[in-house]
């Protein structure tokens, strides 16, 4: 992956919804992580978000945020005023596909947060998940 990541074209990268960098932890960092959500708690939150999506999209041809069409994004990805201002500020850096992917991921983050609208922090988290390394030296495998 390290060798070829820099060769992947932007249109191909645009088809990836989430790209996140992981860093290696040393022993002390791993052992002193504090309280974290258990896998069971995370699973429960994801299942609740899926129920929210299934209910929201009842009667539609799709069930989940990842399946939204461009029209679906317009209808269901309602932004708070500060989220809209933030998105307007970064819009020129996005492709149309990237714009829609960010909104779909932000909608999912808002669902996990039980939020009716997408807020700025949901949107900025989604943007972070679209931050691809600029060269192959930052890619962890």
Please provide the spans of the model-predicted regions.
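Basic, amphipathic alpha-helical bundle interface domains used for macromolecular binding and assembly
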Residues: 1-140
């Amino acid at each position: 992956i390290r060798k070829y990541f820099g060769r992947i074209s932007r249109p191909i990268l645009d088809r990836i919804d989430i790209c996140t960098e992981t860093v290696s932890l040393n022993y002390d960092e791993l052992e002193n992580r504090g309280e974290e959500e258990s896998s069971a708690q995370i699973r429960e939150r994801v299942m609740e978000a899926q129920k929210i999506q299934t209910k929201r999209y009842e009667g539609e041809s799709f069930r989940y945020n990842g399946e939204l069409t461009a029209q679906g994004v317009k209808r269901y990805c309602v932004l708070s005023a500060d989220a809209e201002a933030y998105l307007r500020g970064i819009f020129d850096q996005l492709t149309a596909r990237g714009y829609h992917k960010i909104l779909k991921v932000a909608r999912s983050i808002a669902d996990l947060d039980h939020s009716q609208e997408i807020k700025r922090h949901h949107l900025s988290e989604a943007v972070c998940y679209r931050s691809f390394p600029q060269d192959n030296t930052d890619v962890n495998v």
